[in-house]
Amino acid sequence: MDRRALKFMQKRADTESDTTTPVSTTASQGISASAILAGGTLPLKDNSNIREKPLHHNYNHNNNNSSQHSHSHQQQQQQQVGGKQLERPLKCLETLAQKAGITFDEKYDVASPPHPGIAQQQATSGTGPATGSGSVTPTSHRHGTPPTGRRQTHTPSTPNRPSAPSTPNTNCNSIARHTSLTLEKAQNPGQQVAATTTVPLQISPEQLQQFYASNPYAIQVKQEFPTHTTSGSGTELKHATNIMEVQQQLQLQQQLSEANGGGAASAGAGGAASPANSQQSQQQQHSTAISTMSPMQLAAATGGVGGDWTQGRTVQLMQPSTSFLYPQMIVSGNLLHPGGLGQQPIQVITAGKPFQGNGPQMLTTTTQNAKQMIGGQAGFAGGNYATCIPTNHNQSPQTVLFSPMNVISPQQQQNLLQSMAAAAQQQQLTQQQQQFNQQQQQQLTQQQQQLTAALAKVGVDAQGKLAQKVVQKVTTTSSAVQAATGPGSTGSTQTQQVQQVQQQQQQTTQTTQQCVQVSQSTLPVGVGGQSVQTAQLLNAGQAQQMQIPWFLQNAAGLQPFGPNQIILRNQPDGTQGMFIQQQPATQTLQTQQNQIIQCNVTQTPTKARTQLDALAPKQQQQQQQVGTTNQTQQQQLAVATAQLQQQQQQLTAAALQRPGAPVMPHNGTQVRPASSVSTQTAQNQSLLKAKMRNKQQPVRPALATLKTEIGQVAGQNKVVGHLTTVQQQQQATNLQQVVNAAGNKMVVMSTTGTPITLQNGQTLHAATAAGVDKQQQQLQLFQKQQILQQQQMLQQQIAAIQMQQQQAAVQAQQQQQQQVSQQQQVNAQQQQAVAQQQQAVAQAQQQQREQQQQVAQAQAQHQQALANATQQILQVAPNQFITSHQQQQQQQLHNQLIQQQLQQQAQAQVQAQVQAQAQQQQQQREQQQNIIQQIVVQQSGATSQQTSQQQQHHQSGQLQLSSVPFSVSSSTTPAGIATSSALQAALSASGAIFQTAKPGTCSSSSPTSSVVTITNQSSTPLVTSSTVASIQQAQTQSAQVHQHQQLISATIAGGTQQQPQGPPSLTPTTNPILAMTSMMNATVGHLSTAPPVTVSVTSTAVTSSPGQLVLLSTASSGGGGSIPATPTKETPSKGPTATLVPIGSPKTPVSGKDTCTTPKSSTPATVSASVEASSSTGEALSNGDASDRSSTPSKGATTPTSKQSNAAVQPPSSTTPNSVSGKEEPKLATCGSLTSATSTSTTTTITNGIGVARTTASTAVSTASTTTTSSGTFITSCTSTTTTTTSSISNGSKDLPKAMIKPNVLTHVIDGFIIQEANEPFPVTRQRYADKDVSDEPPKKKATMQEDIKLSGIASAPGSDMVACEQCGKMEHKAKLKRKRYCSPGCSRQAKNGIGGVGSGETNGLGTGGIVGVDAMALVDRLDEAMAEEKMQTEATPKLSESFPILGASTEVPPMSLPVQAAISAPSPLAMPLGSPLSVALPTLAPLSVVTSGAAPKSSEVNGTDRPPISSWSVDDVSNFIRELPGCQDYVDDFIQQEIDGQALLLLKEKHLVNAMGMKLGPALKIVAKVESIKEVPPPGEAKDPGAQ
């Protein structure tokens, strides 16, 4: 049967079987709808995606043709259980098609279903209603255009993305199944070639949806490389192109059939798309003829020809995408990019002549239509985006890159936009665009047919630009058109040249045809990193060379030009065509790569897309399978951030369809491109190679099917793949861990706020050994399901039956049945895997998976006592848990290092388990992913499920923090949880031990770990991690397991309703979460901009006995985001344990318990406000920190409550809390004294997780560890830790992510494309490099950098790295301020003018005025004076609260807050509860806050009282004094070494300093002068000195 028939039949079968979604024509919609109905807005869980789940199984079955039979059993079973009946009719067709050698390319359409028609219908039906929720529509097609109900439902929460993993399903579940089977076949060149004979336009439902929902006005024509074209390029490209072509064929056919039949209805359903639908129908009708017809003819035939078109050119670059076949990736409407940039296509036809800003000129030298095209698009952008990039190469088409970045001269862009706007106003683009749409669609059909060949060829374009750029002939490629462009003979010559390069093109005569050359790098969202992965981003099944959404990743967040990509082809008249790239400049990098790898890249991009789309699962699995996994892991560290960003972009591309999704991915995307070209090239090339060779599918955000080796365990793959697919689909909306072609794993949070978590097992599997990965993926998928099932069973057993019902009656049944039998098998397996004891959870997952396998294999065993599974889990758990956690870590982003650490830890615990660990880790990751899915899907019931899961994990007896982190990430924020895997990685970095080995049984008894739910509140992911004593982990593993489960459930519940299933077990998580948070923050930091879902920093210390965790952070997250409200309720009940256990879990757990129990109990209630309750407890501080950092959610995972936290915390901390909230964490204040220190450490840990992650990922973990140890011991340590966290937090919101991204930040000029690789040209992430000077940065960056430096720097050892400007207190790196007292001449002048009393205070870091502003400086000055007067306590609090808010608002705050805090703490040590961390920071207000933390309190006290005369100073006093002096921090060690005490200091002369200490003369003079001034006025000077501190 031809694919069209198959798809049509599948559609019908799916439609018939899909009763839930009458609107949706395809089963995928039905499944999505049913999943939506079942799962509500969050289809992350299997229960929500019940049908999809079966479909996923089918996918897996299809992928594993050998496994299809067993698959069919499972399908049957799943159809029975999951109600997945959609697949059967299609499956028969699939098998037949497979046997017939028909390859289904739908897998390649990972995000976008291969059936453009179906997708369009679905998208239309879903999109038309959901058009208002633009985000939904893109998501819909990503997810295969689930039914509109689901789309709309999902739109708010990570829209249909969850389905995305089952994107094939979304397109058509049946299609998806075909795809799974087809993927392998599609990779076979022979099959694909045969299949590609008809190459209709391939329009992914996503694209269609984008068109309909977003009304994309740009026609994103992605023409697959024609098979014949591909023949020259390479077999793999052939595969990709064939697949793409086949997909196009199928899609076109489906579209034709659907458009003609049900398609019209679906098209009509997409309200705005209705004209497009008619056009599409016309195109489809004319699709066959279009190739032969000139655009004018087509237009005439279609009847949509505009006057300009009739006159002349088929230069339709951007059409309103309403009718265009390729729905825009982006959600309807520009989710993120302001001004509807790109909503209307920018149709700049000719770039040959400079754009004149005044005229409505069409930029169309050759095309008269261009005016119309551009003219109607006044909304195109905000005048920044379009610019004419002059190219020196006359022959090469001039490409104009419209990027939101004003990389290209903004004026020109504005002019272009102006001209565009004028043209838009003058010309009614809607009619013309509709005509264009018809024409272009026809043309595109022709061109795609023609250009399928041409695209690959264009890559070979003599001009390097074109080489990689996908040459898409947007304009109808007809000699008539070029003839119309008479003067454009040059252009046609160029076109001809390009086409000559494209000579392979079937229609050489069409050389006259204009080709829009879209460099994939330019087109794809991700440029550098995503040159290949542009396909991945597009991979949602978008085979289009032009990626549908052009996402401008601005600081604002993803800005999809996406609805419209502007492709300007050189005009036949010879004018160079403009390439308006709504895609972020990152695309340019791709262009370079493409040029470099012209032939391959041209093919590769197509393949990248095709395979990225189709290979997403393969990529994961194959990467896992291939030895690349190790390299991938290695690459992960280097490329992880870029790929995370890439994947985030991809997720964004997929999630951009969701309204919220774009934000996170955008940053990630550009970050990805931000990676240097070389990095991208290396990665992309490696990815391309891997894809070309391995045909690794780029990780689709939701892997519809993990394509494990076909030969691999079919049952597991089927079950696991299915589960993975379902889970991934479910999770797709949530954190999506995308495995880059490089094998890097990315967890991308969908902006919708639902964390998109690709199952770690799958995604992370790539990192692990291929063989293990396959098995692990399978096992892990099964284990995930099994664990979920077992957890459900346990829950049922443990009175969690209700929870199971919540989760999914179907899942519960399936899992229960499977669990029984599988648990037995898994018991044996677990016993067998005793080496893999870490697989306890993993095996639980395996049990689930294998049970699923066994369901087909032996359902009889399902009835075995659940007790066996539980017992087995418990038995195996202790060892396996750690291993799985390690595995998870390994699979996590930067997990190699973490893996080594965790593996070492786990090996130390269970060396024999090391081998099992890799698999188990992956499995655990999968479990975690499943947990997240469950969490997301079953937020209400998730707690029970998670609890059971966690119980199982904890039963494993090993730290399964990863599950918690994931639960946290699931807790609510796409951005908030940048990546569950990132969190896991961070957690693993913090230590496998942190994972509180929570035995499944011990409920919340152990206070060892508190879990901070990571939520993106505001822009920054506020992932406060919990701190748990690793010792306590071991001690109370069972309790922690329970707690952890509860915590996860609570976190998830917190996301929904923080209701810990085990009320006591809210605090299962330990430092690993912290690490995770830091990782996530780093990852999410940029992404988090849009979603400030401060996940409640559930810095709930687990009280040892009650195990009551205050989901403080959850409650606080309430302020930040969805989680917040629920958490509060839970925390109050847990109040006693509310305090986070300081991360130094071993010590602090007890103190933390004490601390927690007292304030915490109240805290929980306040949690909702923020972690204020926490603040009342020492704990609050994590929230409080977040909140005070409200500007930077990082601190405040509680940020949502960061402000709230400030207010709430302040009461507990009295005066300090305000200042703390402003800067530090009130929670410390709440704790007060040692306890507060402990909680401080906790806070610090959390903060570190965020802030450190920003400054340094390792630091965050180490800080947490340090805090853990020190928090118990010293308040100062805690304080410093806290400070670190605080600084890191403020950075975390902005810089943290950038820190992750920063290596990638580049600006490239490639082929006239200016590629800016970051939202900011060079983000503040630079603070990462201590030697760089903040002053080098622009004010914003400077402020953020200073925040980072001050907070993180001070916290860590600001003294060592940072020096405070004496005047404004701005923290500068020593390298810069090394010999200077002031950061700027202005400060020096101010200091001279105000030297009298405030000078010293200003000199200290207290005044952040430099950045903050005069007011803030005045506040600082007043604070300094107050400090000097010892009025600090009374005055400091209000002032701090005042100044911090100001400072908090600005990045400068951290410096301010530190000084203020220091001042506060100085006046009264009691203030420490306020900011015990602050107190530490204050002492070290100078950069050496950490170093001086011990002495600082004294010094501040001394300051408060008059500091003793200099002559009585000790060496430490002198060192602190010197440390305070700007530019002298570097010499503190010299003073200490020289043993210069107060008396010696008085005797010092400049020559002594210069000669003996090797100081520069300037600092020596300053020191001497300072000493002289202090000698003259001892108290003021001393006050000044203390102020400095």
Curated annotation (Swiss-Prot):
Function: Polycomb group (PcG) protein. PcG proteins act by forming multiprotein complexes, which are required to maintain the transcriptionally repressive state of homeotic genes throughout development. PcG proteins are not required to initiate repression, but to maintain it during later stages of development. Component of the PcG multiprotein PRC1 complex, a complex that acts via chromatin remodeling and modification of histones; it mediates monoubiquitination of histone H2A 'Lys-118', rendering chromatin heritably changed in its expressibility.
Residues at which Zn(2+) binds: 1365, 1368, 1383, 1387
Zn finger spans (FCS-type): 1356-1389
Swiss-Prot/TrEMBL GO biological process terms: anterior/posterior axis specification; central nervous system neuron development; follicle cell of egg chamber stalk formation; germarium-derived female germ-line cyst encapsulation; heterochromatin formation; mitotic sister chromatid segregation; negative regulation of DNA-templated transcription; regulation of transcription by RNA polymerase II
Family annotation (PROSITE patterns): SAM_DOMAIN, ZF_FCS
Start-end of Gly residues biased regions: 260-271
Entry keyword tRNA processing: no
Keywords linked to the UniProt accession: Developmental protein, DNA-binding, Metal-binding, Nucleus, Phosphoprotein, Zinc, Zinc-finger
Name listed for the protein in its UniProt record: Polyhomeotic-proximal chromatin protein
Expression sites by tissue: Salivary glands.
Gene: ph-p
PANTHER family the UniProt entry points to: C3H1-TYPE DOMAIN-CONTAINING PROTEIN-RELATED, FORMIN HOMOLOGY 2 FAMILY MEMBER
TM regions (residue ranges): none
